[in-house]
Amino acid sequence: MRYRPLYNIALALLMIVGLAGCKREGGSGSDPNPPEPVPQMPTIKIPRGELRAVWMTTAWELDWPHGNYNPKVQRELYTDRLDLLRKYHFNAVFFQVRPMGDAFYDSKYEPWSKYITGQRGQDPGYDVLDFMIKEAHERGIEFHAWINPYRIETRPNNKKAFGPLHPSIPRGWVWDLEKIRMYNPALPEVRQRLLDIIDELLTKYPGIDGIHFDDYFYPEQSQGAFDDAADYKKYGSEYSTITDFRIDNVNKMVSSVSQMLRTKHPGVTFSISPGSNADHNLKDLYADTRHWCKNGWLDLIIPQLYQATNPTSQSGFYQRLSWFCQFSYKTPLAVGHAAYRVGEEGFSTNADEISKQIAIARKDSRVYGSIYYRLQDLVDNRGGILDRLSKEYPTVMPLPCFSRTTKAVSPVRDLSYKDGRLTWVTTGKTRSVIYFTSSVDQEAVVLDITEGSSLEVSRKGYYCVTALNEDNLQSKISEVLEL
């Protein structure tokens, strides 16, 4: 008991010291040596990734190979086209690999395309897709495999006979209409065949970045009448109308492709490019784009907005874009532009119209870029379109990330400068995007996208780097380096 007073005195002293410490930490100004403030690192705004793509049409040899059946000439033509796209900072090509119930590769389901050799079923003597995919990737260009899900053959009218049906395609799966031969969309066997074809394609060529459908579903009325009453009787008992039955046949196809891709090929982007008229899509082609987007079946929707920006027209570019932006829900959207209409009366005498459309699209955060129909019109610089795009696309740009399964990317570290070069350290299998701005008040531009970890630079200003994975997901920016 005799030590209690000393204990109380010690406790009181501790409380006084503690209160004094709290007072100093509260910032009363009583500390004669306050800690130095931590310097704020500069930060810069970087642009969002943007799709810059082109459709490369092989049906009727429109864009490739133009009647050139020599493998060496074909390869040179293709790489020349890729070099042009790289020069103008494109980052994706949508190449038509199945234009007419055929294949640009050795398939057990369908014959070699006649558009490679001039003869349906003839082996071209080289692996066309392997070459094309590798050459595109070497130039930093994604390769999306464009497939027509139902079309097998076309003809001008029924006075001309269709060719013999390939033995791999059962006769009972096919409609022969006035102007088109196509798979019957009502048949479960047809849906399964399409799944098998896509799975085979992606298994053979894992480097493919995307699967793409265009706007061909049920046939246009102008292509000929079809009779599916027997199919409706056999498969349609749960539907109140034959229209609902047809719409759901296409829905089932789109849904099953989406599910298969996400299960077996999760890194592959699934996109569809419907026509611009939503009523026509639904009532004539039985393509319910709203339903696809609302259910999240697509990674990207690319409406073909081939109209001019007429502010007074209810069917102009702006009005159609507004509709698709509203009813794409959470599905990313890109715009299909009519490069083939540049210089056409009622569209534009030059490429001004395309620039207007790009400007309108870029103002909407739901739009992630552009794709142009078609490649040959760019090659021909129709109406000066390439000259204009060189101003719209002054530097390279990474693509947006459309994948729903990709994991976060580790940022680059140790960004430094010495002897005229930036260097940095990456983690894992990634590319690097290098950004520059002369002022922190201005949005940065992309200097380069590289698999390396250094870049020669000379301009005074601010630099940062992001890591970019194979799904185009970018990391947070590195520290900002001022030179």
Question: Language-model features: where?
Answer:
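Active-site-adjacent "subsite" loops/lids of carbohydrate-active enzymes
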Residues: 49, 57-76, 145, 150-200
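Glycine-rich, aromatic-flanked loop segments that form ligand/cofactor-binding clefts
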Residues: 49-53, 90-100, 128-174, 212-214
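Catalytic domains of carbohydrate-active enzymes, especially glycoside hydrolases
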Residues: 76-102
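Polysaccharide-binding and catalytic clefts of secreted carbohydrate-active enzymes
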Residues: 90-91, 98, 139, 167-291, ...
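Substrate-binding cleft of secreted/luminal carbohydrate-active enzymes
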Residues: 299-313, 331-404
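Conserved aromatic anchor
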Residues: 420-428
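Beta-strand-rich modules
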Residues: 457-474
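Extracellular fibronectin type III
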Residues: 471-483
